[in-house]
Amino acid sequence: HVSDSSVIRFTRTLGYSGFMEFQRAIRKAYTERMNSVSDNITIPSERLKLSISKLDQSDIVESYFSNVMQNLNSCINRNDTIDFERAASLIAGSKRKFIVTSRANSCIGDMLLLLLKHLLPDVYETSHPALNVIDHLCDITENDCIVAVSFPRYSEMDFLATQMAYDAGAKIILITDKASSPLAQYATQILTVSVDSNTFFNSYVAVLFTMELLCSFISKKMGYSTEAKLELIDKYLSKVGLF
């Protein structure tokens, strides 16, 4: 067993201010080394070529179901209760909550926006035809947080958004596929889940599960404090039959 003080002394000997900076440097170096391989694998056209022969030789329903189940298991195996509780506390304790997603991840962001709006005040999405995420985060502070959802091929805009939030001292809750994700170096709390697929697109079923599970932890944390808000929403939506 190595003591915490020994680890800190070692990282400072290497020229880092502490273990966290050392950890970020290791993640960044690993990511840069792996990206050339990851990029080749995640290009949709190349993934399609690799997957066609496998799909031809197997039952598509059974194969895809098995793949989704493996991804769901990855959420449970990689993240424990403490990870979800910490992420929930960071979100609930922040003044403003910004949701950062792009492209295919936007479907997760839309659902997350809906659920968090019902649970907490001051929840904002950062995608808008007239504004980009940088415009939305230009006045973010250390009292705020972002919830970023990013998977291969990681969006450069998502990366810049997390960097911007980090520079402002804001908390960053990241849902991604692995701890070596380019955005992970800036994250306060990471939740990892696999999006592996046997075809050309990422599978987001397990990501949706992870997001819903996170919202369940937030709901439990908030308790009955959201009851009045939910009743108010239902009161007016009932008038137009929108549920």
Feature annotation, model-predicted:
Residues 30, 36-39, 122, 165, ...:
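Juxtamembrane helix-loop transition sites at the ends of transmembrane segments
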Residues 89-209, 213-223:
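Glycine-rich phosphate-binding loops that contact phosphosugars or nucleotide phosphates
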Residues 82-89:
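A short, basic/flexible loop-to-alpha-helix module at the beginning of a structural domain
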Residues 224-243:
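A short, charged, Gly/Pro-tolerant segment at domain boundaries
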